[in-house]
C-alpha cells in the first residue's frame, strides 16, 4: 500500500482468530485437548461435532470430535504474538481475501507448555480472519451489500500487515 492509498478506513485489523484441535473421538482424549486449548488461549473451549458419519474413522454423526476457541480483540493479538514466531508462514497460507491459517504440530512448542507423558502431544490449527473497517455492511441483516473490490483485502495487504504488526517473515 503506497502513501497515497493510506486512509484509516483501509487499515486492516484482526476480526477473529480460531484455534482448533481435531481429536477424532470423544472421551478422555477430547478432555485433554480441551484442557490444553484452555491453557494456551486462556479461554474456555467449545466442542465441535461431526457433521456426517464416516465408517473409515469410526465416527458417527453428531459425535464430538474436537474442540475450538474463538479469540477476538486484544486476546487474539496476544495469542498471535506467541503463535506466529512458532509457525512457518508462506504466501500460499493466505487466501484471496487476506485470511490465513497455519498449523502447530506440537502444543509443546508454546512457551507455556511442557511435555507431560500423561497427556501426550497434540497439534492444533489456527485460522486468522483479517478485515477492514466497513466489512459489517456485508454481514448485517438489513440493507446488506457487497464490499467493493477496491476495499477488499488482498494477499499483499495481509502479508504487509502481518509482517509489520508482528515482526515475522512471510516466505514467498
Swiss-Prot record:
Presence of keyword Transferase: no
Gene3D superfamilies for the chain: 3.30.1440.10
Pfam families: Ribosomal_L5, Ribosomal_L5_C
GO MF terms held by the record: rRNA binding; structural constituent of ribosome; tRNA binding
InterPro entries the record matches: Ribosomal_uL5 (IPR002132), Ribosomal_uL5_arc (IPR022804), Ribosomal_uL5_C (IPR031309), Ribosomal_uL5_dom_sf (IPR022803), Ribosomal_uL5_N (IPR031310)
Example GO BP: translation
Keywords associated with the record: Ribonucleoprotein, Ribosomal protein, RNA-binding, rRNA-binding, tRNA-binding
Keyword Transcription in annotation: no
One Gene Ontology CC term in the entry: ribonucleoprotein complex
NCBIfam families: PRK04219.1
SUBUNIT field: Part of the 50S ribosomal subunit; contacts the 5S rRNA and probably tRNA. Forms a bridge to the 30S subunit in the 70S ribosome.
UniProt family annotation: Belongs to the universal ribosomal protein uL5 family.
Protein function: This is one of the proteins that bind and probably mediate the attachment of the 5S RNA into the large ribosomal subunit, where it forms part of the central protuberance. In the 70S ribosome it contacts protein S13 of the 30S subunit (bridge B1b), connecting the 2 subunits; this bridge is implicated in subunit movement. May contact the P site tRNA; the 5S rRNA and some of its associated proteins might help stabilize positioning of ribosome-bound tRNAs.
Protein name: Large ribosomal subunit protein uL5
Organism: Haloferax volcanii (strain ATCC 29605 / DSM 3757 / JCM 8879 / NBRC 14742 / NCIMB 2012 / VKM B-1768 / DS2) (Halobacterium volcanii)
